[in-house]
Regions:
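Mid-to-C-terminal alpha-helical segments outside catalytic/metal-binding sites
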Residues: 86, 132, 136-155, 161-190
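Catalytic pocket-lining loop regions of alpha/beta-barrel enzymes
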Residues: 2-153
Length: 190
């Protein structure tokens, strides 16, 4: 990374079917942390895609769930605790994670025997530990992201060159009635 002057890497939401908290990935996370690198997580190899063979469901439903799976595996697996300075960012507004944080937190509280086996810290405590991108396709969803994590934890998303990306990156932000400072914080110069 240093030789090529890279600031970070992109990985999938799972690697060869292994969740991101798998011990095989600890050396990668340790090296990234030591280098001060960022890790961008994009969903791929979607779980359950065999059951979603019509209507483009793997991309419409599977990808948001896959991203939530990645975030949950990292936080329940204690990766944010092991590497507190490691910077993670997640595509598509963090998938379904932020929309289901209440359910995730409730599950953690009522079933710690299943959820808190590797990390006993409340999932809600992690909302300021990572970034998400702005590509959520809907102003209400973008407003919700801002409410949950703050505009300083949201980066401009494009999903280029994929068809679910914005044709003009940042168009949703540009056309919104958000304050100019918020737009700038989201990576869109007003």
């Amino acid at each position: 990374m240093n030789e090529l002057n890279f600031k970070g890497i992109q990985i999938g939401s799972n690697i060869n079917g292994k969740n991101l908290n798998d011990s095989d990935f600890l050396p990668i996370f340790e090296a990234a942390s030591d280098l001060g690198a960022s890790i961008f997580v994009h969903p791929w190899d979607i779980m359950g895609k065999e059951q979603m063979n019509k209507y483009w469901l793997p991309w419409l439903v599977g990808m948001p769930a896959e991203t939530s799976r990645a975030i949950c595996s990292l936080l329940f697996g204690g990766i944010f605790e092991k590497f507190p300075n490691l910077r993670f960012a997640f595509a598509h507004g963090g998938g379904s994670f932020l929309a289901t944080i209440g359910r995730i937190q409730h599950g953690f509280r009522v079933r710690p025997d299943l959820c808190a086996i590797d990390n006993n810290r409340d999932p809600i405590d992690y909302l300021n530990k990572f970034w998400v991108d702005s590509l959520v396709h809907d102003f209400d969803s973008l407003t919700y992201l801002i409410k949950k994590v703050g505009d300083e934890k949201i980066v401009l998303g494009s999903d280029y060159p994929f068809p679910l990306g914005e044709a003009i990156p940042g168009e949703l932000i540009e056309q919104s009635k958000l304050p100019n400072q918020t737009k700038e914080n989201l990576g869109f110069p007003y």
